[in-house]
Amino acid sequence: MTYKEIAKKYLENNGITIGDTIKINKEDISYEGILLDRSEDSEDGYLVLKLDSGYNVGVAIENTQAELIQKGDKPKIGYGAEDIAHDPSKQNISIISTGGTVSSIIDYRTGAVHPKFTAADLIKANPELLDYANYNVKALYNILSENMQPKYWVEAAESIANDISDGSDGIVIAHGTDTLHYTAAALSFMLKTPVPIVITGAQRSSDRPSSDANMNLIDSVVAAKSDIAEVSVCMHGSLNDSYTYLHKGTKVRKMHTSRRDTFRSINYEPIAKIENHSVDINPNYRYTKRNENELEVNSAVEEKVGLIKSFPGICEELIEYHIDKGYKGLVIEGTGLGHVPDKLITPLARAHDENIPVVMTSQCLYGRVNMNVYSTGREILNAGVISGRDMTPETAYVKLSWVLGQTNDIGEVAKLMNKNIAGEFNEKSSIKYFLN
C-alpha cells in the first residue's frame, strides 16, 4: 500500500485496506466505493474510491468518518500466473514501464490499480500481444509524468541500452502523457540505436470503455518490430480506434489536454501510420534502418537549465534571477519570429558574457525562428543568443540540457545546438507541416 502517514494511519485505525468496499461520510455528503491504491508520489491526506458508476473520486479525509462495508479479496495481479512459453520464431520485445495510465492493470475483483506487473500480468490484460512477440517486461519506476526529472531520462536510456545489449529486438516505453514528448526528445539525443525504441501512453485509463491503452500498446509493439530504428512516439491518430500515428521523437508534442489524438508532429509529418496493426511508413521520410547504427549511449545531462516564456509584462529580473541562481543554460520562448522586449537584451548579453548559453525558440510552435528580419531580433543575435530554428521549446530545452552534459564551452555549445543530431530541426520549412 502506497498511502502515506496521515492516510495510512486513518485506514489502519478503521481496519481498512486496499480493495475494501467502504463508505466515507463527510458533512452532508457520502461516498461509497472500492478503495484504490495511489501512486507513490501522490499527496497525503486523500483516499481514492472507485464508485459504482466506474469513475474514481478523490476524497480529503479531514473531518470524515469511514465505514467498512465489505472486505475485499486479495489482489490477483502477479499471483499464480502461469509461465508464458518462449516462441523462437518471434522477435523479443522489451516493455519498460515508467508509470502512467497505459502501464497500469485494473484488478476488477478488488478495484486495485497495479502499475508494477509481470509479463504474465501484461499478457492477461492484453492477450493479443502473444500474437506479436516474446516479452521482457520491467517497471523502471512508478511516477506521475509531471514529476519526471532529467535524471530519470538517464536511467531510462541506460536501461534501454542494457536491454538492447542483451538481445532485445525492440523497445516499448510506457509513459505518462504529460511529459512524454520531453522523454522522447531526451532518448533521441542520448541513444544511437540499432533497433526501434517506441514510447507510448494513454489518455484514458484501461477501466474506461473509451480507453486507448490497449491499441496504443499493441501498435507500439508492432512499431518496435518494424525496420524504423529510431526513437518514436506511438499514439492515436484520430478520435476513434481506426489507426495510430508514429511521430519522430524530437518533432512531437502533446497538443490537447484530453483528446486521444493529442500528440501531433510539429513542423513535420508523422513518420508512419499504423492501421490494422500494420506499419505504413511515410514515403517522404528517410529513416534509419534496423542495425544501420551500432548502439551508442551518451546520457549525461545538465539539470540546471531554464525554460522561460516571454510575455508583455516580463522584466529583466527574471533573466537576472536565473543567472544569479547559477543556471547553466536558458531556453527562451520568444514571440513570433523569436523576439523578446528590448529591455531583456542587456541581461541576455550578460548571460552570454558569463558563459551561459541562451537559445531562442518561438511560442508559435509552427514555423521557424528568424532573428534577422527585425531590428530587435538582430540585437538579440548580437547579444549572443542562439537560434532554435524550428525546434519546439521543449525539444530545444532537452537538447540544451543534453549538450551541456557533453561540454560547458559556450562556443562548442553553439556548434552542437546548430548541428542536427537527431532530426530536431529542418533546414527548410514546408507549408504542409502546419496543423497536419
Curated annotation (Swiss-Prot):
The gene is gatD. One of its GO terms (biological process) is amino acid metabolic process. Belongs to the asparaginase 1 family. GatD subfamily. The active site is at residues 101, 177-178, 254. GO terms for molecular function: asparaginase activity; ATP binding; glutaminyl-tRNA synthase (glutamine-hydrolyzing) activity. Keywords: ATP-binding, Ligase, Nucleotide-binding, Protein biosynthesis. CDD domains: GatD. The keyword Protein biosynthesis applies. Its EC number is 6.3.5.-. PANTHER family: 60 KDA LYSOPHOSPHOLIPASE (PTHR11707:SF28), L-ASPARAGINASE (PTHR11707). Heterodimer of GatD and GatE. The keyword Protein biosynthesis applies. This is Glutamyl-tRNA(Gln) amidotransferase subunit D. It is an enzyme of class 6 (ligase). It comes from Methanobrevibacter smithii (strain ATCC 35061 / DSM 861 / OCM 144 / PS). It catalyses: L-glutamyl-tRNA(Gln) + L-glutamine + ATP + H2O = L-glutaminyl-tRNA(Gln) + L-glutamate + ADP + phosphate + H(+). NCBIfam families: asnASE_I, gatD_arch, PRK04183.1. The lineage of its organism: Archaea, Methanobacteriati, Methanobacteriota, Methanomada group, Methanobacteria. Allows the formation of correctly charged Gln-tRNA(Gln) through the transamidation of misacylated Glu-tRNA(Gln) in organisms which lack glutaminyl-tRNA synthetase. The reaction takes place in the presence of glutamine and ATP through an activated gamma-phospho-Glu-tRNA(Gln). The GatDE system is specific for glutamate and does not act on aspartate. Residues 91-420 form the Asparaginase/glutaminase domain. HAMAP family: GatD.
